[in-house]
Amino acid sequence: MKTRTQILNEIKTIEKIGGVYKWYMTKEGAYQLGIPLNETTIKNGLHLVYVGLSKDMRMRLQWHTGDKHRPSSIKSGTLSVLRQKLNTLLTGRWDGKEEVDQFMDQHMKVEFEYSDNYETLELREIQANRLPLNARNNPNFTEFRRELSKRNGQAKRNSL
């Protein structure tokens, strides 16, 4: 598992091929954000909270770890979905880049694997784990995700 800073420092070593990534969070970080952790997968003392896929792992990890939260990204909705959700829970807005960076540095780590079958692998991971921050194909944490979706929309409006 790697920290946000490690990913940014090693970004050129990450291949531009498909794969699946998994974001883990400390119990303290989840508590701070109000993220439910019941029955989540635990690895190295961290809780698995989000799984994603990409056809270009370098680009996707750079996006999640270093997105600039530009007004144009906020307006168009192209801000990293993970960062949207973290920002919503931290500040009620989408323009708090520093807050998200600091939170990720203190409370989150990511691991990834390359795969030609990344779509199938991601679906398998979502179905096999309880993931509070995943929306698509996720039957778990319905109430939390519904409330987060409402708050996320308001956070975007608060940032424009």
Where do the language-model regions lie?
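Boundary/linker segments flanking structured domains
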Residues: 1-160
